[in-house]
Curated annotation (Swiss-Prot):
HAMAP family listed in its UniProt record: Ribosomal_bL33
Keyword Methyltransferase on entry: no
Family note: Belongs to the bacterial ribosomal protein bL33 family.
Key words, A-Z: Chloroplast, Plastid, Ribonucleoprotein, Ribosomal protein
Gene Ontology CC terms, in alphabetical order: chloroplast; ribonucleoprotein complex; ribosome
Alphabetical list of InterPro entries matching this protein: Ribosomal_bL33 (IPR001705), Ribosomal_bL33_CS (IPR018264), Ribosomal_bL33_sf (IPR038584), Ribosomal_zn-bd (IPR011332)
Pfam families assigned: Ribosomal_L33
Gene3D superfamilies xref list: Ribosomal protein L33
Protein origin, superkingdom: Eukaryota
Record protein name field: Large ribosomal subunit protein bL33c
Lineage start: Eukaryota, Viridiplantae, Streptophyta, Embryophyta, Tracheophyta
Swiss-Prot/TrEMBL GO biological process terms: translation
Localization in the cell: Plastid, Chloroplast
SUPFAM superfamilies xref list: Zn-binding ribosomal proteins
Amino acid sequence: MAKGKDIRITVILECTSCDKKSVNKESRGISRYITQKNRHNTPSRLELRKFCPFCCKHTIHAEIKK
């Protein structure tokens, strides 16, 4: 039985370099990934290196608010 809120939550990771380029209208889009994290093990914001198809390289993807 789970007490309180669920431990595993779904989070959205967004490319940080595409986010900066979208202000200047250089990027074709913003890369986003959906994943899960354990709230007890990682209470802070999640940051992972993932492949961005718009930048054509591996960049840091950070967790965004829903």
